[in-house]
Amino acid sequence: MREIVHIQGGQCGNQIGAKFWEVVSDEHGVDPTGTYHGDSDLQLERINVYFNEATGGRYVPRAILMDLEPGTMDSVRSGPYGQIFRPDNFVFGQTGAGNNWAKGHYTEGAELIDSVLDVVRKEAESCDCLQGFQVCHSLGGGTGSGMGTLLISKIREEYPDRMMLTFSVVPSPKVSDTVVEPYNATLSVHQLVENADECMVLDNEALYDICFRTLKLTTPTFGDLNHLISAVMSGITCCLRFPGQLNADLRKLAVNLIPFPRLHFFMVGFTPLTSRGSQQYRALTVPELTQQMWDAKNMMCAADPRHGRYLTASALFRGRMSTKEVDEQMLNVQNKNSSYFVEWIPNNVKSSVCDIPPKGLKMSATFIGNSTAIQEMFKRVSEQFTAMFRRKAFLHWYTGEGMDEMEFTEAESNMNDLVSEYQQYQDASAEEEGEFEGEEEEA
C-alpha cells in the first residue's frame, strides 16, 4: 500500500540517493544483498512503501537511477548497497550533459527520456496503490536540473493525480561549482513551479554550516552532507512506513503546507543534530527537540526564516512520546513567536508522531517549513542570472542546443513573480482585505 517510486538523476542526485537507500535499508533491516535480517515485525509491515519483494524473499528498492554519463552510477554500483538495486533500473547515456541545462532538457536528455519512462512505468505498475514519486537532483548542473525537470513534466502528464515530491539542491551563495549555475537553476525553478507538488530546498552551504557549527566536523565531506539530507528524507516518509499515533503522508503534507499552489518550496531541518562525541550525554526531551527544530541554524537551505514569516509548517516527530506534549510545544512556539507566523492562517503548524525512532536515537524530529524567507534564495539566484543574462554571457551554449532567448526571459520573470508573491503574503495582514490591489504594485 501507498508506495513511493524513487528517482535519482545526475551526479548529485545519485550520491544523495545512494546514501538515502543505505539509511532506509538499515531502518527496515535489509542488508546490501536485499535479504531481511531485522528483529521486529514492524520493519516488515509496510516495507513495500520503498521496496518490492522479489523471488526468494529479496527486497529490491523501487528506485530508478538515471544519468547522462556512466561514472557516478558505476560508483553507486560498487558502493556499499550497490548490489541491492534492480540492474534494469540503471538508465544512463555516455555523452554527459556538461553542466548544460539545454543538453539535459532538450538534446541528450530527450534521447534518453523514453527509456527512463519505460522503467518508471514498470515500477508504477508493480505498485498496489502508488502514492507518488520522489526525485533527488541538483539544480545547478545539467542532468539533474535539465533532464530531471524534463522527467518530472513527463511523469506529470502520465500520472497527473500522483504526488510529485522533489529534493532539490540549489546553488549555494558563496560556494559555486559551475559558472552557469544561475542559468540552470532559474530554468529549473521555472519548471518546478509548474510541475512539482512539493520541493524540499537544500543547499550545500547551509549543510556545510551545520556540519561545522553543530556537528563540529572540521573537514565535512559530501558523504556527511548527504547523510543529513537522507535523515530528512527518511523522516518525511516514516509515517507511511511505520505505525504512528498521528499519521502524515505526502498528500496530507501538501494539503497542510501549501496555501497557494505556486508557493510549494519548503525549508527542511532535522533534529537532534549533535556532534559524534556528545551524543551519549544528552537525554532528549520534546521541548529540546522543538527548540532545535525551530532554530534558524538548523535549516538546510541558505535562507534565514527570521527574515520572513511562516505561512505554514509541519513537524514530524519520531519515537515514544506523549502527543499532548508535542501539541503543547507546538502551540508554545506559535504563541511566543507569533510575529514570525502569518496571522491570517490560524494554527498553521501541523504535527505528526511516528512511534519508531531512527537507528541509534530515542527520538527525533523532522521539520518542514513554508516560509516567505525562501524568497532570499530565489532573489540571490535571480540577481546572478540577470547579471550574466544582461551581457548574454555563456548563452551560446544554450542557444546552440536549440533554446531560444525568450525561454530565459520567461524563466527570469517567472522567478521574479515568485519572489514578489512571497513578499506580498509576507506583508499581508488579516484585516486589510480591500487593500490588496494597491499592495501588488508596491511589491
From Swiss-Prot:
Which residues are listed for Mg(2+) binding in this entry? Answer: 69
Region (Disordered), start-end ranges: 424-443
Q: Which positions are annotated as binding GTP?
A: 11, 69, 138, 142-144, 204, 226
| Swiss-Prot/TrEMBL cofactor(s) | Mg(2+)
One short Pfam family name for this protein?
Tubulin_C
- Is Nucleotide-binding included in the keywords of this UniProt record? yes
Q: Which GO terms describe its cellular component?
A: cytoplasm; microtubule
Query: Which is a GO BP term held by this UniProt record?
Result: microtubule-based process
Q: Main subcellular localization, coarse class?
A: cytoplasm
Q: Which residues form a coiled coil?
A: none
Keywords of this protein's UniProt record, alphabetized?
Cytoplasm, Cytoskeleton, GTP-binding, Magnesium, Metal-binding, Microtubule, Nucleotide-binding
Where would you find this protein in the cell? Cytoplasm, Cytoskeleton
Highest taxon in the source lineage: Eukaryota
A GO molecular function term, named singly, is: GTP binding
Renumbered to this chain, the Acidic residues biased-composition regions fall at: 429-443
For this chain, the family text in UniProt reads: Belongs to the tubulin family.
Assembly behavior? Dimer of alpha and beta chains. A typical microtubule is a hollow water-filled tube with an outer diameter of 25 nm and an inner diameter of 15 nM. Alpha-beta heterodimers associate head-to-tail to form protofilaments running lengthwise along the microtubule wall with the beta-tubulin subunit facing the microtubule plus end conferring a structural polarity. Microtubules usually have 13 protofilaments but different protofilament numbers can be found in some organisms and specialized cells.
Q: What does this protein do?
A: Tubulin is the major constituent of microtubules, a cylinder consisting of laterally associated linear protofilaments composed of alpha- and beta-tubulin heterodimers. Microtubules grow by the addition of GTP-tubulin dimers to the microtubule end, where a stabilizing cap forms. Below the cap, tubulin dimers are in GDP-bound state, owing to GTPase activity of alpha-tubulin.
PANTHER family per record: TUBULIN
Official protein name in the record? Tubulin beta chain
Query: Per the UniProt entry, what species is this protein from, by scientific name?
Result: Chlamydomonas incerta
Instruction: Give the gene symbol.
Output: TUBB
